[in-house]
Amino acid sequence: MVRKLIILGIDGMDWDVIVRYKDKLPNLYGLMQKNNYPHLRSVFPADTTPAWSTIYTGLDPSEHGIINFVNVGAKENTYKPLVFEDSAFKGKTFWDVLNKQGLSCAVILPMNIKEGWEINGLMITRPYEGKIRVYPQGKESIYNPRVDILGTDGKFTSEKDLPALRDEFFAKVNEEIRLTRLAIENEDVDVLFSYFSTTDGIQHDFWRHCDPNHPAYPGPNEHENVIRDMYIAMDNYVGEVMQNQTDTPLLLISAPGN
């Protein structure tokens, strides 16, 4: 049971996409219509890594120092990962602050966090070095997170792999939903936060196949509805949470996927 607040972080969620498919997204569009939504200015740079770091810490990128996946200041014109460790976040995140105030938290698959750490509640990390970590470790058997499903980024890289890539994304969202559903059912906490990656990822890889205005749009194709279908999957789950957790406030947040 989550007593005070459920936060679902839906990465890359685009309001324009929701409006475009509003007839098929009654829960997401209904929330927009009922509660309105704020037009917020993004952090700079407007990228996934610094944006979620700001969401976690409340700090501007100039303060938390997490700027991008790559070192954009390098003189060499090469891809250089900008390495940061959990120490950049530990003790500074909103769930750490809530813990210090005596509130328990469940944190599911947080973006940017690698090995994770013990908190008052539950933490399930994203895959890192071939492993997903569950804290406390005694709860791993309850959740059994599937690293073979969630840890497959980069497996499919060519155009001929698009059908397999599509299937991979939908397997991932199902696993992210499964873990979140289990946590809501099993954890007696004050606040739950769960991060969903697939809306962002599928838009990166399939946008040109779904948008007739994209300069590389190939024309009618078998993948032109995959983004819509991913939003439908998320809409269905948001509806499930609203129906089953009527006494717990729900907050949807996102970051600019690009």
Predicted regions span which residues?
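His/Asp/Glu-rich, glycine-adjacent segments
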Residues: 59-218
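Glycine-/proline-rich flexible loop or hinge segments
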Residues: 10-14, 33-39, 47-51, 70-83
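Metal-dependent active-site segment of extracytoplasmic phospho-/sulfohydrolases and closely related
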Residues: 7, 27, 229-258
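Structural motif
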Residues: 7-9, 191-195, 251
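Short, structured active-site-proximal loop/turn typified by the sulfatase FGly-forming signature C/S-X-P-X-R
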Residues: 18-63, 104-106
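Extreme N-terminal starter segment of soluble prokaryotic enzymes
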Residues: 2-6
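A residue-level signal for conserved active-site and pocket-lining positions in enzyme catalytic cores
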Residues: 11, 55, 98, 194, ...
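Extended hydrophobic/aromatic segments used for targeting, binding, or gating
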Residues: 205-241
